[in-house]
Each structure stands twice: as structure tokens, then as C-alpha cells.
């Protein structure tokens, strides 16, 4: 609510999307009852680990969320023994990699800074243990005498620092909340960003019983917010993107066409191939698509039997009628954690919460054996034949390597659909958002080509019209084009951009120069 009061987009991700309360409070836009999500996957009385809620926010405004949280739960005098500050960021141990290892060792040994800096800058972002092998393959360093005794010693020592702690750093997204003053529970220091930070990592704060909130900056959320703003400014349409219908046929037609550059989660070459073959027609199809395109299902060849059954080339293989309602939507293929939980509960009669504990145990070899020893007698007692139990067990055991949380996929599918909706119905505003916030995997030149294919023109850089961001302009004929931003100029600073905008309008070059 604090974020939305500031017009900052927020959305839940992860298993928290399976909570009906999260949905009713507006934290998650996905209805867990409509999509068969299970609360037990997120939180249950039997769960040993503390649940956490991951919140996606606009990447461009993530620190504003931090400020809101600390303003509400923090204390400006947090260093005082009487402080009631109940929140802080979480630390993580920054370990040595190649560049900082060679720099720190070189400085400690008193080697020439210019020489050490040249070596460090020449190294790619690699493990410190690979420094020597990498340096041998860099021709630009042949002029340096890397075999000199002190230099060779520095390289050898730097390699030995691989993976060792360098210093404490702020975790990129974790904030910890407490029901009392944090100084009574953990050591706290001020981090480089000016926020209080507990000196425990993410695992340590959970071990002492503190609740962790992950605030993740997502560029697609900033892209969507930018597009919605441009739609309102140019088209005078107050679009509530969170309320658009999830059954818009033109949107699914665009996804099926595989022209998905810029669309969240489905723009990679592999995903474009999959959406073309799967041909999503519903929101559930998007959830399945996102879940299937994971390393596990791809390596386990789970996609082919699903597609064959989906398109009627082969019948769906559902091992037992009791499992039909669980596996029908995925054509008999086990894709989701929630399906495993339901299968175990159905065949053994235990609660969903207990079934989730069994699912978690499948992640280790020891746990698999323990579950196996329990599962066969429990399912036999419920009247299932040994052949059926064995087939189901083989599926459950294999699932440990390729399962995915349906609630997580559903939370991802929502911005996937929303970004596809914007690209379908408001392409200029969508392209302006993508070019401004760069949420995807492709360079801007490809997105500019995509804009042209969508019929969206590109207006050149203009000191009188270009702003800090890419914006939509409408011509006299009603056509939309995107104006290139001043920030696209290489090397330009924020101060220079502000100065240019403040000094408008400019009559000519000499006026601009003055």
C-alpha cells in the first residue's frame, strides 16, 4: 500500500503467490483458487524453514521502497541502545575474484599501481584461481614481464585468495524485519548506501528467527509503468494494466506468432520456439510454458510428450484415474511442485502440509530413500496396486531434477501477459518503455528494428524535444513515434541532461552553446 500510494508498481513472486491472503491484500495479482495454487507450498505448520515473500518492484524506484520501509519501521537513532528500529538490510560476504585479488595483493606488495591496474583490467570476470592460465592467453600483456619474481609471486598469491572473504557487502534485495529492536538480536552497522545492516547473511538471519523480505528490482515493472504513463499522457487513456482481461485474443495471437522481443520471460530464442509450438491460448498456458522452459524439463525431455499430447498427436498418459484432476491441465506430465504435493496426498491420505514436507525431502538422495520406504506401504494401504505405485514413484523421483513451483510461474506469467498486452495494443508506449529501462536480453538496435516492424517510427535526437527518457509523440495523422532520449548520447551525465532541458528552447547551435 505504501508503494502504490507513491504510484510504484509492486507484485509478489515465488510461492507467496499461492496465498489467498496475499491475493486479497493486493500483494499478488494471481488468484490462487482459480489456478489451483496451494498455500502449503508457501507456508504450513509443518514447514521447518521460515517462509518469505519476494516482492518485485520497479527497478528504477527500488530504493524508494527501501526508504518507505525504513521510514515506517526504522529509527533514525538506530545506534542507540534504546533504539526501537525493527528493520535493516542483510549483509553478504563478498569473496575474492580475479580482479580484486590481483589489485589487493599488488597493493600489499607495493608493486607499481599502473602495472597492476593494467593486469586487472585485462582480466575478464573470472575466478581468482584461473588468473595465471588466463594471463597466458592475453597477447596485450606480452610487453609486461609477468615472470618477474615479484609479479609472479603476486599472481600466485592472488590465485590462492580465490573464494576467500574480502568484506561484508549489502545483499542486493534482502531486508530483515523484527518485532523488537534489532540491536537486541544482532550486530548492526551502517552500510555504504546509508542503511542499517545486520552483520548476518540471509541464512543467519533466518536461524535467529527473523523474517526476511526480498525487494527485487525488476526492469520490466519499470517498463510497464513507463508505458502506462505514456499511454495516459499521449492517448489520454487511464489504463489499469492490472485489471485488463486475461483472455484477450489479439494478445495471445501475438505470443503465438513468436514476435515476442521485449516481452517478459518469452523473448529468448528457445522460448520463442516453445511458444510457437505450444501456441498459448490461455493464462494457464503461459504458466505451463514458463514452467516447461527450465533446464530440468528440457534435459529430461518432458516438453516433447507434453506437446504431443496437447496437440492430439499422442494420448495423454495419466497413470491412474485418481490423478486425472491433478494432471489433466498438463496432459499427464508432472510439471509443478503443487502436482507432486497433491499426488502424494491423494495416494497416501496425508495432509497437503505433510505432503509438501515429503516433496522437499525428494531433493536429496537420503531423503528420496526415506520417502520411498514410507510411500510404498502408505500407498498400498490405500488400495493401489504395486505396478501403479512403482510407476508413480519413478515419476516422483525423477521430478526432483525438473520441478517448478506453479505459484512462482503464475507470478511470472502476469507481467508476461501484461507486457504482451501493451505490445499488442499500445506498441509505441511499450517500445518507449523497453528502450528506456532495457529489461530484456537484446541490444537497443534490435528493439529499434522491432519497433519499425510494428509500424512505430523513431524520431531523431532533438535538443528541444528529447528528454531524459524515450517518449511517445503523435503526429498530425495520428501516427505514433518514439523520440530518442538525451541519455542515449554516450558519456552524457545526468547533470548535463538536466542543464539541456532547463535551458530550452534553443533557437540555433550558438544559442545551445551559450
Language model region names:
Residues 1-514:
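Noncatalytic, beta-rich nucleic-acid-contacting surfaces in large DNA/RNA-processing enzymes
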Amino acid at each position: 500500500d505504501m508503494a502504490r500510494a507513491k504510484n510504484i508498481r509492486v507484485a509478489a513472486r515465488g510461492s507467496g503467490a499461492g496465498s489467498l491472503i496475499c491475493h486479497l491484500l493486493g500483494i499478488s495479482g494471481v488468484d490462487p483458487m482459480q489456478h489451483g495454487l496451494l498455500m502449503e507450498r508457501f507456508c504450513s505448520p509443518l514447514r521447518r524453514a521460515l517462509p518469505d515473500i519476494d516482492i518485485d518492484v520497479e527497478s528504477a524506484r527500488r530504493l524508494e521502497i527501501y526508504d518507505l520501509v525504513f521510514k515506517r519501521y526504522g529509527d533514525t537513532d538506530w545506534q542507540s541502545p534504546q533504539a526501537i528500529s525493527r528493520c535493516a538490510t542483510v549483509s553478504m560476504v563478498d569473496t575474492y575474484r580475479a580482479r580484486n585479488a590481483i589489485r589487493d595483493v599488488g597493493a600489499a606488495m607495493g608493486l607499481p599501481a599502473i602495472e597492476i591496474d593494467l593486469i586487472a583490467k585485462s582480466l575478464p570476470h573470472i575466478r581468482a584461481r584461473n588468473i595465471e592460465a588466463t594471463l597466458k592467453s592475453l597477447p596485450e600483456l606480452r610487453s609486461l614481464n609477468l615472470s618477474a619474481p615479484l609479479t609472479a609471486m603476486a599472481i600466485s598469491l592472488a590465485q590462492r585468495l580465490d573464494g576467500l572473504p574480502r568484506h561484508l557487502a549489502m545483499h542486493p534485495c534482502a531486508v530483515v524485519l523484527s518485532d523488537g529492536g534489532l540491536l537486541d538480536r544482532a550486530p548492526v552497522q551502517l552500510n555504504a548506501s546509508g542503511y542499517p545492516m545486520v552483520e548476518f547473511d540471509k541464512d543467519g538471519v533466518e536461524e535467529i528467527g527473523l523474517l526476511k523480505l526480498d525487494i527485487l528490482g525488476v526492469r520490466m515493472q519499470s517498463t510497464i509503468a513507463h508505458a502506462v504513463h505514456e499511454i495516459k499522457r499521449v492517448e489520454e487513456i487511464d489504463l489499469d494494466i492490472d485489471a485488463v482481461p486475461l483472455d484477450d485474443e489479439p494478445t495471445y495471437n501475438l505470443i503465438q506468432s513468436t514476435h515476442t522481443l521485449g516481452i517478459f520471460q518469452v523473448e529468448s530464442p528457445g522460448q520463442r520456439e516453445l511458444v510457437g509450438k505450444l501456441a498459448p491460448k490461455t493464462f494457464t498456458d503461459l504458466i505451463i510454458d514458463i514452467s516447461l522452459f527450465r533446464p530440468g524439463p528440457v534435459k529430461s525431455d518432458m516438453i516433447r510428450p507434453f506437446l504431443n499430447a496437447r496437440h492430439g498427436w499422442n494420448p495423454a498418459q495419466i497413470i491412474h484415474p485418481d490423478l486425472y484432476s491433478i494432471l489433466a491441465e498438463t496432459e499427464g506430465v508432472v510439471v509443478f511442485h503443487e502436482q507432486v504435493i497433491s499426488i502424494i496426498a491423494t495416494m497416501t491420505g496425508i495432509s497437503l502440509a505433510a505432503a509438501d514436507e515429503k516433496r522437499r525431502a525428494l531433493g536429496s538422495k537420503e531423503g528420496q530413500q526415506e520417502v520411498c520406504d514410507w510411500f510404498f506401504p502408505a500407498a498400498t494401504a490405500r488400495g493401489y496396486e504395486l505396478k501403479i505405485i512403482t510407476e508413480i514413484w519413478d515419476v516422483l523421483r525423477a521430478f526432483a531434477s525438473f520441478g517448478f513451483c506453479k505459484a512462482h510461474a503464475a507470478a511470472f506469467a502476469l507481467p508476461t501477459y501484461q507486457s504482451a498486452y501493451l505490445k499488442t495494443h499500445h506498441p509505441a508506449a511499450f517500445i518507449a518503455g523497453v528502450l528506456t529501462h532495457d529489461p530484456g536480453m537484446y541490444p537497443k538496435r534490435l528493439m529499434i528494428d522491432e519497433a519499425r516492424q510494428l509500424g512505430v517510427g523513431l524520431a531523431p535526437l532533438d535538443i528541444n524535444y528529447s528528454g531524459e527518457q524515450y517518449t511517445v509523440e503523435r503526429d498530425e495523422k495520428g501516427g505514433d513515434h518514439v523520440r530518442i532520449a538525451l541519455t542515449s548520447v554516450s558519456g552524457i551525465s545526468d547533470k548535463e541532461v538536466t542543464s539541456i532541458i532547463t535551458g530550452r528552447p534553443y533557437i540555433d547551435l550558438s544559442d545551445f552553446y551559450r
